[in-house]
Amino acid sequence: MSEEKKEAVVEPKAEEVKEKEQIEEKEVEEEEGTNKRTSEEKDKKKHKKRRRRQYDDDVPKDSETKEAAEDDEEEEDGEFDENNLENEEDVEDDLAEIDTANIITTGRRTRRKVIDFAKAAKELDAENGVVREDDEEEEDGEFEVKE
């Protein structure tokens, strides 16, 4: 009888193990189901992109002519910009040299440094005023007034 009791005891344990395995399998299937859903969602997203691409290929004839007209306008604008680039390069060459007094050599950050902009503007005007007067005299000589 002791053997029968052991077998009886062993059988419920085997059943419990099977139930646990079934529960675990269900959980795994549910997890895989969520994974399948995410992969299905990815497939849907890819599918949407493909559809969108197909729509881009099917352009009505009216819009094709409009795009061609816009392309012509863009080409004209590009030619105009190329002519102005030469003038901009000349303007950039006229820039004054960097004043070494404005360079901070301490290596520290300049945050919270109090700057008196009014004073700086006056100093710059005083320095540039001499240069401006020279330029104005040259311009006056080149410019002739016709009466």
From Swiss-Prot:
Main location: nucleus
Annotated family: Belongs to the CHZ1 family.
UniProt biased composition (Acidic residues): 69-97, 133-147
Residue spans of biased composition, Basic residues class: 44-53
Domain of life: Eukaryota
Subcellular location: Nucleus
Region of interest called Disordered, as start-end residue ranges on this chain: 1-98, 128-147
Segments of skewed composition (Basic and acidic residues): 1-25, 33-43, 54-68
Keyword check for Transmembrane helix: no
Signal peptide: none
GO cellular component term of the entry, any: nucleus
Protein name from the UniProt record: Histone H2A.Z-specific chaperone CHZ1
Keyword terms of this UniProt record: Chaperone, Nucleus
Pfam families membership: CHZ (PF09649)
Free-text function comment from the UniProt entry: Forms a chaperone-bound H2A.Z-H2B complex that acts as a source for SWR1 complex-dependent H2A to H2A.Z histone replacement in chromatin.
